[in-house]
Structure formats: C-alpha cells, structure tokens
Amino acid sequence: HDQRLEPVDLQLLGTSASKQQRPGRDQAAQADRSDRPAGEQQHQDPDALLAQFPGAQGERLVQFAGSTADSVFDLINKHAMDVPHTRNGWIQGAHTAAGVAQVQHRAAQWAKHGVTGARALSGSETAALLGTDKYLGGWLDPRGGGIQPLSYARGLARAAMNAGASIYGQSPATALHRDGSSWRVETAQGASVRAERVVLCTNGYTGALWPGLARSVITPNSFQVATEPLPEAVANTLLPQGHVSSDTRQLLLYFRLDHQRRLIMGGRGPFREPSSPTDWAHLERVLGRMFPAAASAPIAYRWCGRVAITRDFLPHLHEPQPGLLINIGCMGRGIGLQTAMGRAMANYLLSGKADALPVPVTAVAKFPLHRFRQIYLSAIIAWYRMNDGGLA
C-alpha cells in the first residue's frame, strides 16, 4: 500500500501566504501563540472548551490545545532543523481592568489543568518583562515561544522529503474531482495527481476547490512590520527575558524580538489588499508609542497574510466524501495548531478512528451574511479600533 505524500498547491515553499511590501530577504516572522483574532481568546479557555464539548471530547480538545507548542519545538529538535527559535514563554498583556480579570482567570484555569508555571502577573511585573508600561497586568504561559516560520516551513519540507514525500512547487491546485475509486487533483501546470485520499488545507486562501468551503470562513488580513536590527542597548530593554507577547484587545497586538534583534509587531489592517506602505502606518505608530526607545528605528519589512476565522473560533474538520478530509480555520495560530493537527489527521487517516481527532468532523456550513463580509468586517474593525485603547 503506497503511503507516499504528494503535496501540491504550493508556490515558493513557505512564502505564498505572505505578501511582502519589500521584496528580497526571507524575513517573515511571527510569534507562536501570539496572533489571535478578535473575539477568539475567550473560546480557548479550558472551562469554555469543556462546556462546549463535554466529556472525553472536551478533555481531548483541552489536551490538544495545550500541546500545540510542544508539537512545534519537538519537531524542530527531532529533525535538527535550522530554525531560529526561543521558548521562554508567552505573555498576554491586559490593557483594561476587565482584561486583568480575564487573564487572572485564564492563568488559574491552565494552572488547574497542570501547566506548571502558568501565573498571573502584576502591572509592574508585566512592564518589566515586556519593556512597556501600556498594560495593567497579564499572565505568563511558559509553554509558548517564537520561531522563524519560513525556516520552519523549509525544515518541515526537508524532513518530509527525507521520509519519502514528494513536494511540487509552483503548482497551484485548480480542480479536485472523483476519478473512479480515487481522487484527481488538477494543477495550473496541466499536470495532475491521483490519490486514494486528499487532505485539503487551504485555510485563508481557500478558493473554489470544494463547493461552499470558502463561504464557511471569513479571511481578514493580519499585518506585520519588522524594524532594522536594534542596537544591543535598546534591544536589551525590550522583552529582556525573551518572551513573546500578545494582548487582550479585540484587535489584538502581538510582538517579539527575533534572532537578529528586530522588533516585530503585528495586528489587524484593512480587509482589502494593501496598496502602499501607509496601510501599515497604524502599526508603526503603535510600535513607537509602546516602545519609545525603538520609535526611531527604520522599518525594514512590511507584510501581511490572510487568516481564516470560523463561526465558533475553533478549527473545523470536514469529510464531505470518503477519502477527502478538509481542515480549515487556524484563526492566525497556524504554526502550532496545524503542526499538531497534521499529526492528528495523519493518525485518523491511517486508523479510521475519530477519537484521533481533537474536534468532531462536521458538515461544511456557510458563515452568516458571507457576501457582505467586507462591509461588516470593516465596520467592526473600525469600531474595535476606536474602543481598544487608542494606541493607533
């Protein structure tokens, strides 16, 4: 039985999901566990997951949610990947009093579920660990960390090829259909791949490969900027213990220092595709206000990519026909989430046992008012930005 993997729908490996304003060096970086969309955070607390999925399913999901960072760092170490990374913990900063109560509750929940070192932080502790005084408190999750995701994508590809997989670049999939007892995937180059089973993981770039799938998610842009490498004296004052961070805003901010001492900051931007550097101006203003010591640092890179958000802010699995498994909805957390989900899906495809999956397999369902998404999302983003603390 041939178990070879034939991934298609790739452009240059690891780069097709990000549009860089400045071409050149491979500088796409974000913090693992940091890019979380508006409204999603409360749905990831263990108590909320257990309430939504009682019994063994909920316990499985909580365990899965808590293991995603382990999946990433374990693979990096197992395959000796050349991936710049740190694992000193993730801090969620609270920008309001309500946010302080939220993160205190969240820290207590994860501590109750066995996360050693999960704890709430005072305002002064948060300021000392992040290098900014813009938060009233926070919580520390020691499981989190940061990686260079392009290096990670290439490391995964190399490990897969070493295990016998074939990877085809510059071969976007254009059609998917049944061909007797198997599936045929057509590509833009005219070539096709036949397979007994297909896993469809197009997420924020889902097109028309499967009916209704693109209408099951909304896909806002996540924008990021990176400074030129900071002087060591400045960099040492920002996230001095190597944490990565995001916050409790509806339009959250996430930030970290990379291995070259670049300060990287991300957040929401226009729903439309960017047209000029001014589309990143709000992030640059925020960066300067949060970290005055870095305010004069030139911005070296600006880029963005689409994230897929589901109705319930959880990843969705669909199996509309035998041999076709669909995974969609990373909510901006694809590095850890999809690393762990890939292993779970592989176990399911090999065993046929549904309890190998962290979430139940469901039918594809349309997102409400999907055709008007750009209108209402733009209005929601503007409202959130006005009420999120005024940093931008």
Where do the language-model regions lie?
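Helical element adjacent to the flavin cofactor pocket in flavoenzyme catalytic cores
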Residues: A101-K112, D133-E196
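Active-site substrate-recognition segment that forms the wall
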Residues: D70-S71, I76-T86, A173-A175, S182, ...
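A short small-residue
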Residues: Q44-G55, L136, L263-G269, L325
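Dinucleotide-binding Rossmann-like beta1-alpha1 core, especially the glycine-rich loop
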Residues: Q42-S124
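Helix-loop-beta segment of a Rossmann-like dinucleotide-binding subdomain
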Residues: G55, D82-Q92, E125-A159, A163, ...
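Short, strongly patterned local motifs
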Residues: H1-H43
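General small-molecule cofactor/ligand-binding pocket signal
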Residues: A118-L121, S166-Y168, A300-R302
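C-terminal catalytic lobe of FAD-dependent flavoproteins
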Residues: G269, E273-A392
